[in-house]
């Protein structure tokens, strides 16, 4: 069994914030994979189901970000799980939007949600770092993470969340390579190989056929050619 935790802040006010991308990811997984309805438990909300062969409990702590470890610790104790059975999905300033990285252990890098987890369960859990980019100035970080994703970012965000959901069974099974491939297939799909599409009426328009090298439109007839043609008509 695995416990997959999405980090964020509860309430409609924060729902679309960059800091809540962990919540967004587990909500997408629950919706796409037929999990049970969300219900209150462990100082948060849980949904239960399966990802491939793995039984999974999804958790959204309702303690606010800075106390996330309280909720996760309670869930772990009840479910009798070790830190290596926990996968935490969280926002990552040091990755560009659309990028994800998997990591086990290590420091919290100033992330308050991870700081709380370290205090309550140690650092041996797995984590999926979901890139949100950096505002460029550390003094702007607090406002940046608590601001909503821009409209221009929505399409890329949706592709990323779909990719995470597509690879969720691999994530739960510990198949990191297959998970990363699933994300990449959504975020950076293979470009057209150059073959003609089955239905050229859809997608990119066909390129016009190339003109032959001796296309008469390319070089209009000279005056002498026109006079010669006129002479031929009256012979």
Curated annotation (Swiss-Prot):
What domain of life does the native source organism fall in? Bacteria
A Pfam family name for this chain?
Pept_tRNA_hydro
Residues that, per the record, bind tRNA: 14, 64, 66, 112
InterPro entries cross-referenced by the UniProt entry: Pept_tRNA_hydro, Pept_tRNA_hydro_CS, Pept_tRNA_hydro_sf
Compositional bias (Basic and acidic residues) at which positions? 225-235
Query: Could you say which protein family the record assigns here?
Result: Belongs to the PTH family.
Name of the protein described by the UniProt record: Peptidyl-tRNA hydrolase
